[in-house]
Amino acid sequence: MHFNFSERESELRKAGVEAGILCHALSFEECWKIAATQGLVASIVPAEFGGPGLNAIETAISIEGFSEGCKNGGFTFSMSAHLLAGLVPLVKHASGDIKRRILPKVVAGEYILANAMTESGSGSNAFGMKTTAKADGDNFTLNGTKIFCTNASIANGILVYAVTDEAKGFFGGITCFFLEKEKHNYTCGKPVQKNGLHASPLCEVFLTDVSVSKENIIGKMGSGVMVFLESMNWERTVMSAMHAGTMTRLCNLSRAHVKARMHGETALEKHQGVQFRLAEMFLQTESCKLQAYKAAKMIDKGEDVTAAAAKAKVFSSEALNTIAKEALILHGANGFTADYGIGEIIADAQAALIYSGPNDVLRNLIASRLQ
């Protein structure tokens, strides 16, 4: 594993930071256009469909840079969810027809994706779902309700996971379907009011006798578990890099503040207690980056990244919460004001402990794979 970026990787990170900075105080739609122009919303789309064709490590580096530059955590999360839980399954498993129709639109910034997995009765047991897809000739009829669907209300397409064979259960009994807003009559509930990630839309998705062609199956019949787990490995890996980008911004803000802030005739940075806090912030940020990059490299090498991705997500989400609170302390009363934005990051960071799998559930997964 190398520890120095190539020239291309350095350029990707720099472009990500610059794109993030450009998004300051802009609307969701304006931010999406900027991210699309930089190839961020379609990073993994192959060149044959007009995309950048980035691999996992390049995608992680790009998103890390964007997260460092962009102060809108909700938008960064929505873009990442679109990319990792939505686009990864399409690029890896969709039919040639779907790829030819949809991927160029994603590259152009004209198509947003969402994922519909979670249900109210299943909680962290995502595959205890009740949503069904009943075969009807060349079509399937979907019925059920999905909750906590990021981007669903603004999405042009949604990946829906449903039970197609209850007897087969976890492996072989769940299938992923691609529903298109223009073709399929699913409906979205009212926006969920959240404590953080305010720019990221969240809602329920209602499926009532929604008819979808078998051609819209992503992967193979009954392969929904594998499709979903692969996307979660990507999501946990790249969102760990996303967390690291936000942490880098917090570290740099805090360092600049304690260098400039005087206590009497001495800058705050000269006090040992402040130095300890700052050093710990940078230590945890560097550790997060290394874990995220390691997992991304494993994806690119075709290795089993399940445990590494879970480790990166658990560590980075908890470190993000710690560092955000440390940044507030180092900024003193200023850190508690809205102008500095640290309180908003603290609120956003709470969600990181839950999305992509709650950390305690991921700890169980990690423990089950100890050698």
Each model region followed by its residue ranges:
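A short, charged helix-loop
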Residues: 203-230
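Well-ordered alpha-helical segments within folded domains of soluble proteins
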Residues: 82-87
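A short core secondary-structure module
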Residues: 143-188
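Short Gly/Pro-enriched turn/cap motifs at secondary-structure boundaries
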Residues: 121-124, 148-151, 167-168, 194-201
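Alpha-helical interface subdomain recognition
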Residues: 1-73, 79-81, 93-98, 105, ...
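Conserved hydrophobic/aromatic beta-strand scaffold that supports enzyme active sites
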Residues: 114, 130-132, 157-161, 176-178, ...
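A short, Trp-centered hydrophobic/proline-enriched beta-strand micro-motif
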Residues: 109-118
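Flexible, small-/acidic-enriched active-site or ligand-binding loops
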Residues: 128, 182-213
